[in-house]
Amino acid sequence: MNKIKHAIFDLDNTLWDFRKNAKLALAELYVKHDVASRYNFSFDEFHPHYHESNENLWALIRDKRITKEELRERRFREAFDNLGIFNHELADIFEHEYMETITNFNEVVDGAIELLDYLKPKYTLHIITNGFIEVSKRKLESSDLTPYFDTITYADELQILKPDPRIYEFAMEKSGAKKEESIYIGDDWIADAVGAKAFGMKAIFFDR
């Protein structure tokens, strides 16, 4: 049996708390643009619509049915449309400012730092993320996660997303790791757990 030498992580919602940080960023924009008083919908009414739209569109990206550019065009428009707010100019402003605002928040998943501190002396650590490259870099820097990792593989480098086996192959070549000596940890059943196992790696599904 091969000894595990490399631990490879997903980023969003595995280490960096996307759900919490996204909600904080959106709440800030909601107040900034006075949406509640202009349209008589509270943030708590808006947020589930955004979350559902974003999750559904990322699933379509994973299944190669839409592009990331289409996600950025659609997610806020759909969220506002579902509330009867047909203001696409406002939706587009939210999209632009959201991508800038979200990295002002740097909450990590509970226990993530303690886990990385424990693993770092024992294993070589890496990341593979499907997230937007420039935003992901800012997330890692603002949350002080970067120093833990020897390599970080961004899907945007290849224009290929997990669970496509080519992104795992690219990460192996980049890191010099062997899949038989690696384990992958992530919160997305299809992109992370199924994708890594199909490639031939051991995988841990982080079910939050």
Regions found by a protein language model. Give the residues of each.
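Short loop-to-alpha-helix "cap/lid" segments that border enzyme active sites
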Residues: 163-174
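N-terminal helical cap/lid subdomain that shapes the substrate entry/recognition surface
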Residues: 2-109
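Glycine-rich phosphate-binding loop signature in dinucleotide/nucleotide-binding domains
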Residues: 1-2, 121-123, 174-181
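Acidic, Mg2+-coordinating phosphoryl-transfer loop and its flanking beta/alpha structural elements
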Residues: 179, 183-208
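Substrate-recognition element of Asp-dependent hydrolases with the DxDx(T/V) motif
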Residues: 93-107, 112-143, 149-155, 161
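Short acidic capping loops at alpha-helix termini that bridge into adjacent secondary structure
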Residues: 88-89, 147-151, 179-183
